From Swiss-Prot:
GO terms for biological process: cellular response to heat; regulation of transcription by RNA polymerase II. This is Putative heat stress transcription factor A-6a. A motif (Nuclear export signal) lies at residues 246-253. GO terms for cellular component: cytoplasm; nucleus. Keywords: Coiled coil, Cytoplasm, DNA-binding, Nucleus, Phosphoprotein, Stress response, Transcription, Transcription regulation.
């Protein structure tokens, strides 16, 4: 009896895009006899399994966890530049991803390149024969459950991640817009203050220029100030102690009415001076109070130097009448 030895050769087909992918489906690679007679698997699956199973490439691609039911491409650049050219005739990572999708692999993590297939398990090479390639143009009804789930979980996770990123960017944009509005409001307020300061400086400059051209203005102001001090001293001596007296500004305006015979230019200059002094009225009142207090102290000293006993009865009577006149409302 003659015995013949039949050697089963492995036919290698490199799967690429387009027509070359169809050639891979037409020429599957038979697996070793240990995996079962007649079992065949696509070269793409065999080479992918070998890359993942090789411990020397764990830094680039390896099994995803202790269960070894998924694999992770840790470094896509090194994977495309170093491993793909060794097993395929291309170095295109996108083409590799399309091939995974064709054979029913799904992306199981939105944060890393992790893929899984229920028949692609570590140490179980014989299960590769159960993975079938999806046909182009096949209807939804003829698609296997693995093909339906292909990329489903990963796609939803990617959409959710993009939605969260969009919401975070929208919140950041709203925060930046609020900061811009606040900065713009502060800038407008600062510009308003600067314009007010410049306007006051111009008014002061104009007033000083007019005062130099008409020296009588300063004399009028000095006389009115002295008159205000004198009137306040009289009120204190009369012991009226009321708070409804005229302010310095009112006294100045009254004095301006008394000197209405002056020229029109001088009156205009005086009005500018009153406007400038209006904001410093409190300081002027304090100064007036100090002058009145000094005058009162001097008057007290003089009264102590001249006792009432030395005054005659007629002089005392005349002084009382003067005080009554000053204290009366008609004064």
């Amino acid at each position: 009896m003659d015995y013949s030895t039949v050697k089963q050769e492995e036919v290698e087909v490199v799967v690429l895009d387009g027509e070359e992918e169809a050639a891979a489906a037409a020429a599957p690679v038979p697996l070793p006899a240990a995996m079962g007679v007649g079992a065949a698997v696509a070269p793409f699956l065999v080479k992918t399994f070998e890359m993942v199973e090789d411990p020397a490439t764990d830094a680039v691609v390896s099994w995803g966890g202790a269960a070894r039911n998924s694999f992770v491409v840790w470094d896509p650049h090194a994977f495309a530049a170093g491993l793909l050219p060794l097993h395929f005739k291309h170095a295109n990572f996108s083409s590799f991803l399309r091939q995974l999708n064709t054979y029913g692999f799904r992306k199981v993590s939105a944060d890393r390149w992790e893929f899984a297939n229920e028949d692609f398990l570590g140490g179980q090479r014989h299960l590769l024969a159960n993975i079938r390639r999806r046909r182009r143009g096949a209807g939804t009804g003829s698609t296997t459950p693995r093909a339906v789930n292909c990329g489903g979980g990963g796609g939803e996770g990617e959409v959710e991640r993009l939605r969260r990123d969009k919401e975070a960017l929208a919140r950041e944009l709203a925060r930046l817009r609020r900061q811009q509005q606040e900065a713009r409001a502060q800038l407008l307020d600062m510009e308003r203050r600067v314009r007010g300061t410049e306007r006051r400086q111009e008014q002061c400059t104009e007033f000083l220029a007019r005062a130099l051209r008409s020296p009588d203005v300063l004399d009028n102001i000095a006389r009115r100030h002295a008159a205000a001090v004198e009137r306040k001293k009289r009120r204190m001596l009369a012991a009226a102690a009321d708070d409804d007296g005229l302010t310095f500004e009112a006294l100045a305006l009254a004095a301006a009415a008394d000197t209405s015979h002056s020229t029109g230019g001088a009156v205009t200059t005086d009005m500018i001076w009153y406007e400038l002094l209006g904001e410093e009225q409190a300081e002027i009142d304090i100064e007036v109070d100090q002058l009145v207090a000094s005058a009162s102290a001097a008057a007290d000293t003089a009264s102590e130097a001249e006792p009432w006993e030395e005054m005659g009865e007629e002089e005392v009577q005349e002084l009382v009448q003067q005080i009554d006149c000053l204290a009366s409302p008609s004064s």
